[in-house]
Amino acid sequence: MLRVVLDTNLFVSSILVTVGLPAQALDAWRRQKYLMIISPALIVEVRHTLAYPRIRRKYAITDEKVDQLVSLLEQRAIVVPGAADVTGAIPADPKDEIILACAVDGQANLIVSGDQHLLALGAYQGIPILPVREFLEQLAAS
């Protein structure tokens, strides 16, 4: 089964817009179509991003909804340390390196992202980086 790291922006988008492609990617994981790899740093980033007051107001995000997502991730995803040294891999946006570290530590087959800095890499240490649409097409074809 595919081992996949989803970028934080996809988690956030799937909560904010429940009918889009990011929501479909998360739903495919819930239906056990692939294994999700995640690190504690990515979980913290998801929680932190969903705590922004402007997001909370605009999308009526509650602590309960965030807690449910985090709990699901902690219980069903494969949690890896995300401590691989990937320093300098994304000079334009080093904070995105936590996604690469997670993928390397978790021996991921694929990284899925909407982030242009990550997508521009194309792959990292042999791990392809795809936009969500391509990922869903690949998943449907398998």
Describe each region flagged by the PLM.
Residues 1-38:
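Short, well-structured N-terminal submotif of metal-dependent ribonuclease cores
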Residues 6-8, 38-39, 114-115, 131-132:
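A secondary-structure boundary/capping signal
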Residues 74-110:
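Active-site neighborhoods of divalent-metal-dependent phosphate/nucleic-acid chemistry enzymes
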Residues 62-64, 71, 81-83, 87-92, ...:
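Internal alpha/beta domain cores that form substrate/cofactor-binding pockets in large enzymes
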Residues 28-85:
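PIN-domain endoribonuclease scaffold, especially VapC-family toxins
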